[in-house]
Amino acid sequence: MPKPKVRIIGGGLAGPEAALQAASLGCEVTLYEMRPHRSTEAHLTPDFAELVCSNSLKSESENSAPWLLKQEMRRADSFLLAAAHASQVPAGHALAVDRQKFSAWVTTLIDSNPDITVVREEVTRLDPGSDEITILATGPLTSPALTAELQRLTGSRHLAFYDSISPIVDAGSIDMDKVYLAARWDKGTADYINCPFTKEEYDRFIDALSAAETVPAKEWEHLPTAGQLLEDRLQRSGEEAHHSGSGAENPSLTATRPGAPGLASETWVSQNAQDVQNAPKTTPPPAPKYFEGCLPIEEIARRGHDTLRFGPMKPAGLTNPRTGRWPYAAVQLRQENLRADSWNIVGFQNHMKYSEQARVLRLIPGLENAKFLRYGQIHRNTYLNSPAVLTPTLQLKDHPRILIAGQLSGVEGYTESIAGGLLAGRFAAALAHGRIPEPPPRESAHGSLIHYITHSEAKNFQPANVTFDLLLPLEEELRKKIRDKKERHRIQCERALEAWDQWLSRSTE
């Protein structure tokens, strides 16, 4: 009997995990990836699971929310999490990987699997009437053509925020006489290079950062949204009608998004690009919308002179062995690969011009002669308004044979994306075998993420990392009885893992 087929589009993190899960559950998988024939503004290689931002899969501290999510993934035999452990580099209590080894490991897993066929071409059309189950896992850099196709199917405008990438420096260019190795609060091993600041050095750095020139916004970053264009067009049409004395409806205003009166589709925007040029020049473009968990340092600095000292440059817990005290501020560097010949500047994603980055970042103590292997940059992250279009099993409400996985679904972060792929692969396999998939329990970290992206208020939906705020809270009586936050988190994790194990046993029967 032939194996049921599953088609997966996207070779980032969610797609390969979904492919390996579905193949392990008896499906014949076709995995589509457009690279290298068409790349994105952030990718550098054609490999699967290329990490384009940091190299960290977050905390491994027991009973933390990121740890809980990874524990659930381990119990579900996540292939990419196993690859992360196989390519791990020292990073204190965090799980960080050698990017190239991690990507190579995943690529080998995919290429060597007899039940996975790789097709290197761009997919621009989706057939919701096909008998084949399809998982769309094209990530935050989904191509314009596929984004338009997805919009056509969902009748929903995609959303986006701007994400940034941290710089990487050559290890040999770091002045080790000015820095020191330590882990915050001495958790784990001393795997981070710490660059300590005095108050004077910090003030000078902030002044230079605040005055630095950023990369001019690309045209698409400042294009009015469909709603803004329509509102402007209505206003101009009203003015024309007022001057002409006509109250007749303007027929050109009827091209609105299906199912959403008053909002024009992005396709309509592209077909009426002339409106962009005709838009009022006095109206400033909207400020870029950033994900709060990954703000560019210049954006953080705009929020106050000392804001960075309470964020990426927080000195708390980083005792300088030369002084026996915490510095006024500190920048941390995390090892990029097993050779330890390159280090990334933790949390220092930015949108400055390259020449400005070199000038400003060389004000960091120990990096005065830094050689940059990669500068920071910014790119657009696209995601769906999932509460409006997705079911708790990641299926499109109107086209249930199409599933959405990874960052496109509204989760944020490497681990969360892999987790979404794990679920989508299992859901797709169940559907392909003629079964009804069961969503993960609300108590679990996976279930909490799914609940968030499918039950949030659609109007104000924003991507989310896994946190205890998303998890099912303890009963009020128990919360009052247990005051210690760590103990409450331990109980939440214990309940989550118990519910997850029960779900796993049911879903594999």
Task: Identify the function of each model-found stretch.
Residues 418-438:
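Internal hydrophobic alpha-helix adjacent to the cofactor/substrate pocket in enzyme cavities
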Residues 99-118:
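Helical element adjacent to the flavin cofactor pocket in flavoenzyme catalytic cores
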